[in-house]
Amino acid sequence: MWRAALKSLLGRKVRLLMSTFAIVLGVAFVAGSLIFSDTLSRSFTALFASTVGDVVVRPVGGQTASGTLSSLTVPASVIKELEDVPGVARVDGNVSAFGVYVVGEDGKVIGGLGPPALGVNYNDAPAAGGEGLELVEGEAPSGIDEIALDEATAEKAGYEIGDTVPLLTPRGDSKLSPTLVGLAGFPDGGSLNGATLTMFDTATAQELFLEGRDEYNDVWVTAEDGVSQEELRDAVEDLLPDGIEAVTGDEAADESASQLLEAVSFITTFLLIFAGIALVVGSFLIVNTFSILVAQRSRELALLRALGASKRQVVRSVQLEAFVLGVIGATIGLGLGVLLAMGLRVLFAQFGLDLSGQPMVFGVRTVLASYLVGVLVTMAAAWLPARRTAKISPVQAMRDDIALSESSMTTRFWRGLALAVVGMVLLAIGLGDIVDDVPYSGQMIGAGVLFILLGVAAMSPVISRPFLSAARALFARLFGSMGNLAGQNSLRNPRRTTATASALMIGLALACTMAIVGDSAKASVDKSVEESFVGDYVVSNVFGGEFNPSIADQMAGVDGVEAVLRQRYQFQDFGGEGISAIDPATVDLLELKVVDGDLADFEDGSVIVQESYAEEEGLDVGDPVEVEVPTGKTKWPVAAIYEDNPIIFLPVVTTLTMMEKAGYEPADNALTIFAEPGADDLQAGLDAVVAELPIVTVKDQAAFAKEQREPIDQFVLIIFALLGLALIIAVLGIVNTLALSVIERTREVGLLRAIGVSRSQLRWMITLESVVISVLGAVLGVILGIAFGVVLMYAVRDEGLEVISVPYGQLGVFLALSVLIGMLAAVLPARRAARLDVLQAIATE
């Protein structure tokens, strides 16, 4: 039996090729995701190990929960005291700032998306990891007119030593033009992973980022030989004043790396989800392929049964073929996964996450996961047709054609219906939980969608009969006898037809869902901007970060400006959401609808909160709100409760003064500009203020709405690109099914040619069969996609996405493309059928 199975496999190499390709693509996505994830983890771990000293002395609350620096610092007097501690080799103070952007020769900002733009003071303190940044060319900067850059940033910007480098700073002078005097890098290999690094001398960094105070953001303490990090930390701790802490370099590096890796972990999850989709779609192709091949081998298997082979042996022989196929597919997929990981590295480099300095990490888990996924998915998919074949008696298998009985399809229908009902229940629970932020809601939604898709796929041989019958009648009317034959061939084995269509159904269902989500999100943005937009212009950072507060002062002086409203945000510090701040003197300009309390009571030391948040937390006017800020936990009483407003999208609003006292840097996130009545050409005056600041833009209502829609468009395009993998597999499934069907019907094709059917008529018949399959999959996919999209948007209608918009034009394009897919998928199978030798085909058994 083992020998027979292997010979059968070798005898059908071409037929199994596209099934293998489905496994290859799915495994490649799994392997590529894991390799990229491991490379990302290794890179950040190595990076942070090179950016800490043996012991790091820092203020408690020196970093906000979102990873930015607070305004808390370490006084220089601490350094002098630490220098005399036994076991201390040297002590170095560090000044750091986010938002120091390098402007390239082309006038564009380097970086900005993702990895930070850092400004620091230069020192040559040794890193705990032993591979810190060092000057590799030039000299250290001295004075405000000199800087050093990391090599990668200088290369991207097009600067060499001696060039003048335009800089944008978060505070102080908005723009500087120092001279590049040095380049820094990792002599032993390493990378900043896309971050940009600008280095000043210590006095200049303190002047720019700490208002000239003799203070530091943190301090590195270097140990003498033979002194461990723990021993040095213990010796240092006793001398530190309240509010200052000491941690080992290893602890600081692990903490920073863990926070960042947790923040970017969604990348791996995101990619693995699409790997799963590809494998599910590929499973349909494998099931269909093995079903056809096993049916074609029915006589062969019947003879084996007649010679004494048991049902179990027949199943095992098919499973052996699947095992070999899975191993081959996993091996090729593993190799392709390495290339995919390299491609992901290049792709994410376009968004600022540059891992080019880090070699790819090929871990053991990647190999194990790839083979487990490839082999298990293939064997599981092949088990169903193998089990079904084992139930066929030797005498029954001698017949020319074997199809599922009506009772079998009816059983499949009821099982599929039960599966779909379970999926609906899971989907309802998950969508209800996601609104209430209950754990595992995402998994519930994913499982619900999968069960519904599988349920519909199981029911499709029954529910698709009216469609297939209508297609046969339409084709017969439009294309005559060839159209009638194509329709009858689709109806001959509805299970096979619908199984092939189901692969396309899954991809298009998800694509349609995302199309509706994207279109609804954009429509909701337009509506909220139209209803809630106040003022005449919005000023913001193109990277979504902070910008110099002096810009607001300059814009307030532009002719025609009546008022400027500042907004500042801090994310993830308050219940996982964040806090914002405005000036109480300008709060009336927001035109908030107050439901309780009075905005006149909003002052330093108090907050105003959104209505939905107040209801969720059970807050009334006067109740204290406990907030975790860099200076520690504090309580602010509620002065007023207002209706939710997208202009202030964070739930708790305090004053600018309290934000600064809480330990946050005084930098603005957005400005709303109010024009005086009759002011003309105000945009030109505002643009002039930021003419030399490419990171800050001025937008009217239409431009602001467009800016809010752009991330949605980008996200949907990425989703479509990833779903394209599933659609490619689905198209391969149609090609494979048609090709195997032609082989299965070789004798029938020969008879058609013998009675006068021309080659072009034969090609047209097979093309129509392909169109039926693809259109059926598209119709089912679009219907399910509309249902998923509408239900999903309805479930989150209270989360700011109030508009449900179905892009019927886009869905129509999907249906039109399905016809094109069907015609293209039929090219090779139709060509093969047309080229069959008539006499040999008739003689085929």
Residue positions per predicted region:
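Alpha-helical transmembrane segments, especially those used as permease/efflux helices
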Residues: G11-M18, F266-T269, R365, A369-A381, ...
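Small-residue-rich transmembrane alpha-helices
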Residues: F290, F323-D354, T366-K391, V422-I434, ...
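C-terminal transmembrane helical bundles of large multi-pass transporters
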Residues: T497, A501, R566, D668-F674, ...
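Juxtamembrane segments of multi-pass membrane proteins
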Residues: S66-S70, G446, L450, G455-V456, ...
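Short cytosolic juxtamembrane segments of multi-pass membrane proteins
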Residues: K391-S407, A834-E845
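Membrane transport/envelope proteins' first extracytoplasmic loop
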Residues: W2, L6, G11-S19, I23-V280, ...
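Alpha-helical transmembrane segments
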Residues: V27-V57, S291, A341-A349, G430-V449, ...
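Interfacial "coupling" helices/loops that link adjacent transmembrane helices in transporter permeases
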Residues: M1, S8-R15, A275, G282-G326, ...
